[in-house]
Amino acid sequence: MGYYSLTEITAVQYAKDHGYFEEKANVICHEIGDGNLNYVFKLDDGEKSIIIKQALPYAKVVGESWPLSIKRATIESKALQIFAQYVPDYVPVVYSHDEELAITVIEDLSRLTITRKGLIDGEEYPLLSQHIGRFLAHVLFYTSDFGLQSEEKRILEGTFVNPDLCKITEDLVFTDPFGHYDTNDYEPDLQLVVDELWSDKTLKLKVAQYKYKFLTRKETLIHGDLHTGSIFSSPSETKVIDPEFATYGPFGFDIGQFIANLLLNALSREEEKRSVLFFHIEKTWSYFVETFTKLWIGEGVEAYTKEKQWLPIILQNIFTDAVGFAGCELIRRTIGLAHVADLDEIENKETRIQAKKQALSLGKELIKYESKSADIQLFRTLFQQTVSRGVKA
C-alpha cells in the first residue's frame, strides 16, 4: 500500500488492526500535535490510551515546499529505545514502530504537562534539573567513546546519520539567524538590534566555530532538540520526548539548548520569579557532573579514563561548548524561524520587545564568552549583567 498520511479515522483503524484496541471498541481520537514536523494522535477507549505519532514527508510548519525524509521517524524510535536502555524512567515507552508508514506508537503521557507550558504557567517542577542532569549524563556517557568500545560506537553512530534534520539545525540554529535569510521572523521593532547583530564580525566568527563543532564533532548521541517543549513534567516525573533530531554530535549541545530555554523563560518573568530557573540551570549542571564523574570512574572503557587529570579537561570542554550553543539557541529562538511561547506570548508589547532584545544581547554574550572554568554561575552573572544594562525597547 505504501505511505499515506493518517487522519483521526484511519489512526483508529490502524490501532485496531495492530491489536491496540478491539475492533468493537469505541475509540476516541484527537490530533493533538502542536509541533512543526509531525501528526500526533491520542487514542482512548476509556480504559487505556496510546499515542500514535507519524512523520510527514515535509515540514508542517512550512508545507510541502520543504520536503523531509520520513526516515527520521525510525531515528526517533531508535533513539528513544537507546535512551531507555540507560534511563528508562525518563523516556516514554515505545510500543512499536512502522518504518513504511513512519508511525511510532508510544506511551500516553497526558498525565504530565509539556514543561514549557508548565513553566509559563508558573509551575516549578522541583525534580526537573535532577532528572535532566542525570538523563544527559547517562545518555551522553554511555553512547560515547568513554562508555562504549570504539567499534560499538562507530556502528551505533552509523545508525544515526540524520541529514535532513541536521541540515535544519545547521541552517536554523547556526546560519540563518546571523544574516539576511528569508526564514528569519521578527518584529520591526527589533530591526536596529538585528542589524547590529548581523554586522558583528567577531560574533559571526565565533558562531562559525560552534557550527563547525556541530558539523564535525561526533562525540556522542545527542537528542538534538532538547528544549522545554520536548520534555513532559510533573512534580515527580520527567519524560524526554521527540528525539527525531538525534544524531552524533558534541557533548555540550543538548546541555546548551536546555539551559537556553530555561533562560528564555527567565527573561519572560518578573525579577522575583526567576530564581527557580537559575536553580534548575545550576542543578542540571551539578547533577550532570556528579553522575558523569561516577560513570567515568566506575564504568569508563577508554584506557585514558584512568588518568585523573583528563576528566576536568573533558568537563571544561563540555561546559565551554554548552555556553556557546546556549547563546546560539537564544538568538535563533528570538529572530529565527521557530520561536518560543515564553517570549511571544508576553502580552505587553513593550515588555515583549525588551525581553527579546535582552535575549539577543545575552545570546551574543554567551557566544563570545571565553570560558576559563566550568563555573555554572556564569549564566546567572551574564543574565543579570544583561538585564541591568537596561536594554530598552
From Swiss-Prot:
UniProt-listed SUPFAM superfamilies: Protein kinase-like (PK-like) (SSF56112)
Binding site for substrate: D225, R332
MF terms (GO), sorted A to Z: ATP binding; S-methyl-5-thioribose kinase activity
BP-aspect Gene Ontology terms: L-methionine salvage from methylthioadenosine
Catalysed reactions, semicolon-separated: 5-(methylsulfanyl)-D-ribose + ATP = 5-(methylsulfanyl)-alpha-D-ribose 1-phosphate + ADP + H(+)
Enzyme Commission code: 2.7.1.100
Pathway noted in the entry: Amino-acid biosynthesis; L-methionine biosynthesis via salvage pathway; S-methyl-5-thio-alpha-D-ribose 1-phosphate from S-methyl-5'-thioadenosine (hydrolase route): step 2/2
Family per similarity comment: Belongs to the methylthioribose kinase family.
Protein's job: Catalyzes the phosphorylation of methylthioribose into methylthioribose-1-phosphate.
Protein name in the entry: Methylthioribose kinase
Origin species: Bacillus cereus (strain B4264)
Chain's gene name: mtnK
